Design a protein with these regions (language model features):
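A short, gly/pro- and small-residue-rich
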Residues: 70, 114-125
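Active-site-proximal alpha-helix that buttresses catalytic centers in soluble enzyme cores
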Residues: 2-81, 85-88, 96, 125, ...
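Residues at the C-termini of beta-strands that transition into short coil/loop
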Residues: 7, 79-81, 138, 151-154
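Short active-site-adjacent structural elements
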Residues: 14, 112-114
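Domain-level recognition of soluble alpha/beta enzyme cores
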Residues: 122-146, 152-158
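Generic beta-sheet signal
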Residues: 3, 99-106
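Residue-level signal for well-ordered alpha-helical positions
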Residues: 64-65, 117-118, 140
């Protein structure tokens, strides 16, 4: 199974409601999310399903990716990608989906903890991800995954721009 991790793009510091879940992307964050989506699509990742945190900023990062990958009908929210959740919750969810390639969109420190969990094959390692960065892994469904790439947003933006 191919697992692609995408950390949300730059978000506002505070939401109008004061709730963390309601924080939205900044103008630059929206732009970066679109650039990353184009870069991801240019890589032709074969993604079949996109799971995103229900938080506004993650959803706003996932939506351009879903459009670029022509997967808007395959974009679903899951609480397993909310900040501070146990990475094993989302791993159980993707195993139940029985797909060959999935994109997970979420937050730090959860994404870094999930990435570390996959690379180490067990809890305890965290590999921080920058905003709008993408990691690509191959995982058998148990044990350690193989990290194939860890791409900063600016690299994906260049990939997307060169593909146009």
């Amino acid at each position: 199974m191919e697992i692609w991790l995408l950390r949300h793009a730059v978000a506002e510091d505070r939401s109008g409601s004061g709730r963390d879940a309601d924080r939205t992307l900044t103008e630059d964050g929206h732009k970066r999310a679109r650039e990353v989506a184009r870069g991801l699509a240019a890589l032709e990742p074969g993604i079949e399903l996109i799971l995103t945190s229900p938080y506004a900023r993650a959803r706003q990062t996932a939506e351009p990716a879903a459009r670029a990958l022509k997967l808007t009908a395959k974009l679903r929210e899951t609480r397993a990608l909310e900040p501070e959740r146990n990475p094993d919750d989302v791993l159980a969810e993707i195993l139940a989906e029985k797909v060959e390639a999935v994109l997970l969109v979420g937050h730090e420190p959860h994404m870094g903890t999930l990435l570390g969990r996959l690379v180490a094959g067990r809890p305890g390692l965290a590999i921080p991800m920058k905003k709008a960065a993408v990691a690509r892994l191959t995982w058998s469904g148990s044990g350690a995954a193989t990290l194939r790439a860890l791409l900063p947003a600016r690299v994906l933006a260049l990939v997307g721009a060169s593909a146009e």
